[in-house]
Curated annotation (Swiss-Prot):
Function according to Swiss-Prot or TrEMBL: Binds 16S rRNA, required for the assembly of 30S particles and may also be responsible for determining the conformation of the 16S rRNA at the A site.
Organism for this UniProt entry: Azorhizobium caulinodans (strain ATCC 43989 / DSM 5975 / JCM 20966 / LMG 6465 / NBRC 14845 / NCIMB 13405 / ORS 571)
Subunit structure: Part of the 30S ribosomal subunit. Contacts proteins S3 and S10.
Gene: rpsN
GO cellular component, one term: small ribosomal subunit
Designated name of the protein: Small ribosomal subunit protein uS14
UniProt feature, compositional bias: Basic residues: 12-24
Superkingdom of the organism of origin: Bacteria
Keyword tags: Ribonucleoprotein, Ribosomal protein, RNA-binding, rRNA-binding
Record GO biological process: translation
Comp. bias intervals (Basic and acidic residues): 1-11
Family according to the record: Belongs to the universal ribosomal protein uS14 family.
InterPro entries assigned: Ribosomal_uS14, Ribosomal_uS14_bac/plastid, Ribosomal_uS14_CS
Region of interest: Disordered: 1-24
Single Gene Ontology MF annotation: rRNA binding
Amino acid sequence: MAKKSAIETNERRRKLSQSKAAKRASLKAIVNDKTLPIEERFAATLKLAQMPRNSAKIRVRNRCEVTGRPRAFYRKLKMSRVALRELGSQGLVPGLVKSSW
């Protein structure tokens, strides 16, 4: 089980990145638009730099929904391999059966 503080920090980052995503995308579009004057692009760069670091999507870490484990994460299932194995052996994951041949 991951530390509660790490899970909460990640959730705060996720919420902040979702709320600031539109503003960040518009500023990035201005910065990358080569047809605009350099002063306007530089001003957008400064505004982008003044935004909170945790509002960047890259700061969000994929974590297991069950245990909070940050590694060995399956995106499709939103859980780690350890949790998947435990729940699968209990028969709680639909369609997952223990292999036998």
